[in-house]
A protein has these predicted regions:
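A short alpha-helical cap/connector motif
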Residues: 1-91
Length: 91
């Protein structure tokens, strides 16, 4: 599975992982493909728990437009885009 975000202690990370939604088939495939193709760089991809958190934040604020800067392989972009309304925009 993904490497944890280094700024979190084990207790916070364990809780965040336990309460977040696991990645679906598309995101799981993206994780595997990123690991395979990028090897040492795969740690740049956000974790599934972080993706769930980004989805939640996007929904909670009612975002209609989002700007994604610094995209790696698109995991966070997918999480944000899924949280936008049908007429929402991801730039």
């Amino acid at each position: 599975m993904r490497r944890k975000y280094r700024a979190l202690n084990d207790a916070v990370y364990d809780h965040m992982t336990a309460v977040s939604m696991p990645p679906d088939e598309l995101l799981s495939e993206l994780i595997a493909e990123t690991d395979e193709l990028t090897k040492d760089w795969a740690g740049m991809q956000i974790s599934p728990a972080q993706g769930s958190f980004m989805y939640l934040l996007t929904r909670l604020i009612g975002a209609r437009t989002a700007l994604e800067l610094g995209t790696f392989t698109g995991y966070s972009s997918i999480c944000i885009a899924r949280a936008l309304p049908p007429d929402g925009k991801l730039i």
